[in-house]
């Protein structure tokens, strides 16, 4: 029963993610059954959030 360095060598054997059918990214989790990138398998809508992209500066400078 070891939980240290020897156990960490056994982590990379099984496949966690495969290529997604919808978005094509290597983000489809085999065990959970959904894509971490687009949300395929979890929802019909594509996973998108407002915080993914930087906001454009819309403030006008007062002179």
From Swiss-Prot:
PROSITE patterns: RIBOSOMAL_L37E (PS01077)
Residues engaged in binding Zn(2+): 20, 23, 35, 38
Keywords: Metal-binding, Ribonucleoprotein, Ribosomal protein, RNA-binding, rRNA-binding, Zinc, Zinc-finger
Cofactor note: Binds 1 zinc ion per subunit.
Annotated Gene3D superfamilies: 2.20.25.30
A GO-annotated cellular component: cytosolic large ribosomal subunit
Residues in C4-type zinc fingers: 20-38
Cofactor: Zn(2+)
Any one biological process term the GO annotation gives: translation
Domain of life from the UniProt record: Archaea
Family classification: Belongs to the eukaryotic ribosomal protein eL37 family.
Task performed by this protein: Binds to the 23S rRNA.
The protein, known as: Large ribosomal subunit protein eL37
Species of provenance: Thermofilum pendens (strain DSM 2475 / Hrk 5)
Lineage: Archaea, Thermoproteota, Thermoprotei, Thermofilales, Thermofilaceae
């Amino acid at each position: 029963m070891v939980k240290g360095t020897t156990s960490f060598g056994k982590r990379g054997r099984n496949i966690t993610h495969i290529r997604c059918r919808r978005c094509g990214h290597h983000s489809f989790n085999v065990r959970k059954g959904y894509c971490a990138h687009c949300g395929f398998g979890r929802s019909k809508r594509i996973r998108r959030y407002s915080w993914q992209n930087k906001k454009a500066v819309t403030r006008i400078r007062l002179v």
